[in-house]
Regions:
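N-terminal plug
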Residues: 36-44, 51-101, 116-125, 140-147, ...
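Surface-exposed, low-complexity loop segments enriched in small/polar and acidic residues
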Residues: 109, 208, 215-223, 255-289, ...
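A beta-strand signature from Gram-negative outer-membrane beta-barrel systems
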Residues: 116, 125-169, 209, 718-719, ...
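Short strand-turn segments of transmembrane beta-barrel domains in outer membranes
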Residues: 134, 152, 161-188, 277-287
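Transmembrane beta-strands of outer-membrane beta-barrel pores
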Residues: 139, 159, 170-174, 191-193, ...
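Short loop/turn motifs that connect adjacent beta-strands in outer-membrane beta-barrel proteins
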Residues: 160-163, 190-193, 302-307, 374-380, ...
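Outer-membrane beta-barrel domain signature, especially the mid-to-C-terminal portions
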Residues: 563-566, 570-580, 589, 593-597, ...
Length: 903
């Protein structure tokens, strides 16, 4: 007689669908904890006499035959050292991120295999409340009525869990200059029929100015504290008499400091030498910010198969930025009794009064969400609703009002060199911008099995939704008020289907493996854009239980976001910018806001995937993906102003009579076509440190990674109740298994992306931008050919160490090739964060000496531990002033110390 436990785990993929479980399984928003006798393990005696154990999926698993990209059990989760599900999602970013190339949005999040109103419902839950995490490829999103453009994360909760935790964090950079403090308190209760979570966060960060990073100010401006004189005479001469005293033609001279009536002789001492125009102490690299956020979720079972959940969130964020000093130029007449020059000159200077130019912003965000789940026979009906309101008010200080001061200088009644010159200045009326963005969304999905084929169940999902978007904005600038009011109603419908063609245990499937196809079609009717179509089809082949191939094609039509059309127009002065045409760095005005002339986008993608979990390597999974993206009329933020971009968008750029850059209109634009191809491959591997956990050890310690759903059963025979054991960090102790010890684990996720093609055609008739060979659309240069993502670490006897980072290869941005223009080269960068944490519960001597430390954790986080910042050089090897490392990454290496206590 032979027992095949490995086969038992693999057979979990054919278990009863999670949506059709009996009443007691899905009676709450949380998963009922399962003891050994709750996991059915029917023993069958086949004709060969072999005992076959048929293991079922863990309750709350996703009902799909598509194998997960990654699975994390309780030991894996504990080894990450996360404080919330937000931290946990960040820790598994390499596995959860999609390589489809359609942005870096959050993955789709499920709770116990079901839709929720949004990630807000779960993000503040403590990781100790999670029994298992499953990460699925993009095609599983179709099952839940989503587009297949993001991966899916399913969180399976424990039952009868309760905790109250507080956490304090303090962070500051190695180079000093600013600090961040954050306090968070979280209350969580998960019972037999209810789930409640309340989280309060308060965060404050001080400002960081340019002077605190020793940045060199860009030249070219005569403005300075104290002032500089420039000539208006022949050849720019200030005064023939001054030139005689200085012994050369004088066209510029710094105003002698601390002298109210400087003489020509004193000006001769500053001839052709300017006062320093650095005002870095009045310009911020990072604003002062404050944030208060409250997030709460309540869920209750209304019946055996009916669950209602409600979520509410409020966030208040304020920021203050410094934009420089008031400054202008005056004509000082030669007839002025305070001028020693005898002819007209120009005085250019900054003023410390009234105060630095500022931008103040305050944002109020209120969001609510609800989810209703109900089982209708064999069909799962889910209704989600969301309302979000974001109100923003921005106040930007304009320059001072120099009218009276200028008139007094011209009349000769005001001494422009006096110490109190400009002491009574007042600001002009500030620029004001306010916007209210509201979004109402209701969506209904119905998923189930309409029929069963010999190869398996046909699964279908029907989805319908309604969205109303409202944007009201008002701007007031230079006495002119501009109002924008946009409304958009979206009605959408879609249907998704997955059909098994062959089953491994039926007919020809035993020879050729499992084959299945899926398809989806949907349309959206936008009140301001008309109808938009989306479609997709996919093929899945599993020649072996541990090897899967997938191919899919997706297409959709997309409208610009309502904010991209109607955001208020803002003008930000004194923005550090590099001008490729002249090869210089300077401060200019930048216009941002919405562009009502944008048009819709059409996209089509081809995706090929392969997943392999070899039998001969435990807890190892290898993945390979190929992506090809084609887009027409893409909406993009305004790209980096290279000569190619300036030629295509000449009307967006303003230069003065000398060709110096004055301003850029950076409101969104449409590109005619974008094409990209990339290969992404990677591996997930994990294991235990030391001997395997014996029977009766911590729950879930032997879960498989990357295998089929249900491969990680809840606890070993004779062991504790999986996920049970009362309150605390799971099990019978605070930080893990009975006695307070968690299994020792290590894990590595490593992914490499190789970009084959990244091209943009701005409009027909202009050259194609090749982002891999010298073209650029962002201030970070072109597209990196290579990108590597790493997430890994170990956890042993209460101590944890994690490394998480990204490597990107260098890029270039070509200039015009004409004299004065420069190419820029951007270096490789390896941004690595390190985490070291200790669970004090597992340090018996420490807890005995200080009982308060029971249930606590101390974490040291080092952001950018290598202090690696992109090094930008022109073709002569010089660093452009606008690309000084303080501008690129003003934070640098940051140390953060946190203390978390669970009560």
């Amino acid at each position: 007689m032979k027992l095949s436990s490995f086969s038992a785990l693999l057979l979990a993929s054919t278990a009863v669908p999670a949506m059709a479980l009996d009443d007691e399984v899905q009676s709450t928003g949380s998963t009922v904890a399962i003891s050994n006798d709750e996991i059915e393990e029917p023993v069958e005696d086949d004709s060969s006499g072999e005992i076959v154990v048929t293991a079922q999926r863990i309750r709350g698993s996703v009902d799909t035959d598509v194998p997960p990209v990654e699975e994390l059990n309780e030991a894996d989760i504990a080894s990450l050292g996360a404080s919330s599900l937000t931290d946990l999602v960040a820790a598994v970013a390499p596995q959860a991120n999609s390589g489809r190339g359609r942005g870096g949005g959050q993955p789709i999040v499920l709770l116990n295999g079901q839709r929720i109103s949004g990630f807000r419902e779960l993000r503040d839950l403590p990781p100790e409340a999670i029994r298992q995490v499953q990460i699925f490829p993009e095609e599983v999103a179709l099952k839940y009525g989503f587009r297949p453009d993001q991966r899916v994360i399913n969180f399976i909760l424990k039952d009868n869990f309760a905790s109250f935790s507080t956490e304090f964090e303090h962070a500051q950079p190695e180079d000093g200059g600013f600090a961040t403090n954050e306090f968070e308190a979280t209350l969580t209760r998960i019972g037999a029929s209810t789930r409640f979570n309340l989280d309060v966060e308060l965060e404050r960060s001080t400002a960081l100015t340019e002077s605190e990073r020793d940045l060199i100010s860009s030249g070219g401006s005569l403005l300075a504290r104290g002032g500089n004189i420039s000539g208006l005479g022949t050849n720019g001469e200030i005064s023939p008499a001054l030139s005689v005293l200085a012994g050369s033609n004088v066209t510029e001279a710094g105003v002698p400091l601390g002298i109210s009536n400087p003489s020509l002789l004193q000006f001769a001492g500053t001839a052709n030498r300017l006062n320093d125009g650095d005002i870095g102490d009045a310009r911020t690299l990072l604003p002062k910010t404050e944030r208060l956020e409250v997030n709460g979720t309540w869920s209750r079972s209304l019946g055996p198969q009916t669950v209602l959940s409600l979520n509410a969130n409020y966030a208040l964020t304020g920021s203050e930025s410094l934009l420089g000093l008031p400054g202008t130029s005056f004509v000082v007449p030669g007839t002025s009794p305070f001028s020693p020059f005898g002819q007209d000159v120009t005085l250019s200077r900054y003023f410390d009064t009234p105060r630095p130019l500022e931008r103040e912003s305050e944002t109020h965000v209120f969001q609510t969400g609800s989810t209703f789940n109900h089982l209708l026979g064999g069909w799962r009906w889910t209704v989600t609703g969301n309302y979000a309101r974001t109100a923003n008010d921005t106040r930007t200080t304009r320059n001072a009002d120099f009218m009276a001061l200028r008139a007094g200088v011209l009349a000769g009644t005001i001494n422009s060199f006096a110490a109190d010159f400009g002491a009574n200045l007042l600001f002009q009326a500030p620029d004001l911008a306010s916007s209210v963005n509201q979004n109402i969304d209701v969506r209904s999905t119905l998923a189930g099995t309409p029929l069963t084929l010999p190869a398996g169940d046909v699964q279908m999902t029907f989805a319908s939704g309604f969205t109303r978007q409202m944007l009201d904005s008002e701007t007031w600038r230079s006495g002119v008020t501009t109002d924008v009011s946009l409304r958009r109603n979206i009605l959408n419908h879609s249907v998704n289907a997955e059909l098994p063609l062959t089953g491994r245990d039926f007919g020809i499937g035993s020879t050729i493996g499992e084959w299945s196809v899926n398809g989806n079609i949907g349309y959206s009717d936008l009140s301001d854009f008309g109808k938009l179509l989306e479609y997709g089809a996919g093929l899945r082949w599993a020649p072996a239980r541990n090897l899967t191939f997938q191919a899919s094609i997706t297409g959709d039509e997309n409208a610009p976001a309502i904010g991209q059309l109607g955001n208020p127009t803002l003008v930000t002065p004194n923005v550090a910018t590099y001008d490729f045409t002249r090869g210089e760095s300077l401060f200019i005005n930048v216009v941002t806001g919405g562009n009502p002339a944008l048009i819709g986008e059409k996209r089509r993608d081809v995706i090929l995937n392969a997943n392999w979990s070899p039998d001969f390597i435990k807890d190892f999974a290898l993945q390979f993906s190929y992506f090809k993206n084609n887009s027409r009329n893409t909406t993009s933020s305004f790209p980096l102003l290279t000569p190619e971009i300036e030629a295509a968008f000449a009307s967006r750029v303003v230069r003065d009579v000398d060709g110096r850059l004055v301003s850029i209109d950076q409101r969104p634009v449409n590109f005619d076509r974008e094409t990209s191809q990339r290969i992404r491959w990677g591996l997930n591997v994990s294991g235990n440190i030391g001997a395997e956990t014996p029977a009766g050890g911590p729950p879930g310690a032997t879960g498989a990674r990357g295998g089929p759903p249900g491969a990680a059963a809840g606890g070993s025979p004779g062991g504790p109740r999986a996920g049970g054991g009362g309150r605390g960090f799971g099990g019978g102790g605070r930080f893990g298994a009975p006695g307070g010890g968690q299994p020792s684990r290590w894990n590595i996720a490593l992914y490499h992306t190789y970009r084959i093609q990244e091209e943009i055609l701005i409009r027909p008739g202009v050259p194609v931008l090749d982002l891999l060979n010298g073209s650029a659309t962002s201030s970070n240069g072109g597209a990196s050919r290579h990108e590597v993502e790493l997430s890994g670490g170990m956890f042993h006897k209460g101590f944890g160490l994690r490394l998480q980072g990204t490597y990107k290869s260098g890029t270039t941005a070509n200039g015009t090739g004409l004299p004065g223009s420069n190419d820029l080269r951007f270096s490789d960068i390896a941004a690595v964060n390190a985490f070291l944490f200790v669970n004090l519960d597992q340090q018996a001597k420490v807890v005995k000496a200080v009982p308060f430390l029971k249930g606590s954790r101390v974490t040291l986080r080092v952001e950018n531990i290598l202090n690696d910042i992109v090094d930008v050089r022109d073709q002569n090897g010089n660093v452009p002033l606008g690309y000084q490392q303080g501008y690129i990454d003003p934070r640098g290496r940051v140390f953060e110390l946190s203390f978390r206590k669970r009560f």
